Amino acid sequence: MTDAPPIIRLRHLRKEFDGTIAVADLTLDVAEGEFICFLGPSGCGKTTTLRMIAGLERPTAGEIWLRERRIDPLPPQQRGVGFVFQNYALFWHMSAYDNLAFGLRVRGVSPAEVDARVREVAESLELTPVLRQRASRLDLSAMQRVALGRTLVVQPQVLLLDEPLNNFRPGLREVMRGELKRMQLSLGRTMVYVTHDQEEAMTMGDRVLVMHEGRVEQVATPREIYRRPATLFVAGFIGRPAMNFIETQYQVEDGRAFLRHDALRWEIETRREAVERQAPSGRVIVGIRPEDIRPAVLAVPEGRRGETLPVQVDLVQPLARRKIVDVKVLDLVLKMVVPGTFRVDAGQTLDVVMDRGALHLFDPQTLRAIG
Amino acid sequence: MTRMVTESTPSPVTVAPPVPARLYVAGALRLAVAAGIALIFFLPVLWMLSISFKPPAEWLEYPPTLWPKEPLAGNYTFLFNPGNPEGAIAVMTGAAEPVVPAFANSLVVAPLATLLSVTIGFLAAYAVSRFHVGGTFMPFFTLTTRMFPPVAFAVPLLLYYSAVIPRLIPGLRLYDTRLGLILMYVAFTVAFALWMTKGFIDAVPRHIEEAAILDGASRWRVLFTVTVPLVRGGLAATTLFIFILTWTEFLFALIFTQRFAITVPVQVSHYAGAIGRFYGPQAALGILASIPVVVTGYLIQRHLVTGFTFGLVRE
């Protein structure tokens, strides 16, 4: 992030379709050169937001600014943004060259200049050898580069990408992801990237905007999103396996603050003030990531060690380098992750500790994080 | 650009590996089966071809033979000059007019009606597919109009053509004119054209058109530079289908023409006389009438086979 003025500013953006709200009230600044990912389940409004920036949808309310220009009243071609579609949406019947030249020709650029600019972009994307090939005959990597090149050739200030890797098989996706990221770094272009794949967003984005039901849940760096989810939705959406949630009641015993669920309790003296202020009802949802519940025999830093808790192992799912273990305690089923080398079998009891520093607290009314 | 996946240049030549013998056998078997099926479908055509070269005495032979014993071209010359048949075909008296006007009529009516129908149907299909014009029920409604038996329309339409139109628009003649037939055929085939082309348009991802719109291309430009090329296989198939339909249409051609606008299918029915049906000239005309359809099919077969190469990534 730089101190330079933001390149894109969205102000109270709203979009309704026939009475249903697709985007409720979205305000966002995107910095020059930033790679920002819009992440959320399908139907959350992320693609609609992207299409509003591009000019494919007209906002019901709100403003879109590109640098010093308000662009939401402008037709798409005057906005200075490029759009890369799902599956690339190339003109399959045209050559790679004609795909790249299309935008310039529509804009009435002279043939000589069209040729010069197409060749320049083709050179930078290593497309020169395949310029004469039909788009439908290109390999996937070349298709991706043509899709990018087609938008770059008209020199957009911002690139918008709508789930460009959506329908590629796993494996290829990762290759393409790396290639895209490299391209972004070398082009230094601001990119807004829509995806429903958290791994994609978390690995590629400088920042991630998590959306849910038309609302922004959180905008932050991937690390921040993972470590300090701002809402219950983000906490449950980010991370695999998903975070465990436990309903608790705030109590003070002997002058010390606890969150209690049945016979389980967590001391939260350091966050007492925040809980009392933000959850006056005393009801708190405790979230803990599976990777923060560990077998007691494996070390947790002494100061952060919670109480040792005997649990019943219910199910063990071995993955390549780790195991996902379902454990039962009281009426709860919790997921935990242990190293692949750790021996554990269904039916046995296991002493576990929870990393006290890794507890996430949420208000069940507002669904927002506490503290 | 730092590093890039570099398999983008395809290897120029791929050498086919040697084909194992059992694949040859399988191929030969497949070919034999295909040839057998083709023969079954082609048999009527061969029979017609054979009869078109047979003299009247051999037309009704039983069992039928494929090769004429005394082949002659008389059936064909009779089509063009039915005035006074001579020699082996001298018995074919008291019949038809020359075939040329009917052919001329058909060659005007069918292609024009096809062109109009496919153009209108395609544009309508585009509106339905992309802008949902007419709502969800409209496309189906257009098809239901084709569920009426045409004969139910025939007489009211005949009255409309001969009694109403001349009063409403003096000077416009639709009965027994090429224009009248063309309008009729367009009206009756446009629903098919709409339905066939709609399927192909639906298969073109909207995003491809949006990509062009983002560059500032007008709707018409998008339509003609992006959509039409992508559905040309479908347009070709639709064109051929509608052309066959109109080229061979009989009922309306029979009812709505009398002398001047007679088409080939009606002409085929005219070959009868003192000795009964003139199967030879009918067969000869059947052969000639097949030629435009075959030629049309041949001309557009390239487009029929190509078409959907963009099934590479799913939408």
Task: Annotate each PLM feature.
Chain A
Residues R9, D29, W65, D351-V353:
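ABC ATPase nucleotide-binding domain
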Residues L39-P41:
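The feature captures the beta-strand-to-loop junction immediately N-terminal to the Walker
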Residues T47-L50, V146:
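ABC ATPase nucleotide-binding domain helices that frame the ATP-binding cleft
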Residues A54:
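Helix-to-loop junction immediately C-terminal to a conserved catalytic motif
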Residues G62-R70:
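Conserved ABC transporter NBD signature motif
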Residues P76-G82, Q86, L90-F233:
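ABC ATPase nucleotide-binding domains
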Residues R227, R256-F258, D262-D314, F342-G371:
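Glycine/charge-rich catalytic "coupling/switch" loops of P-loop NTPases
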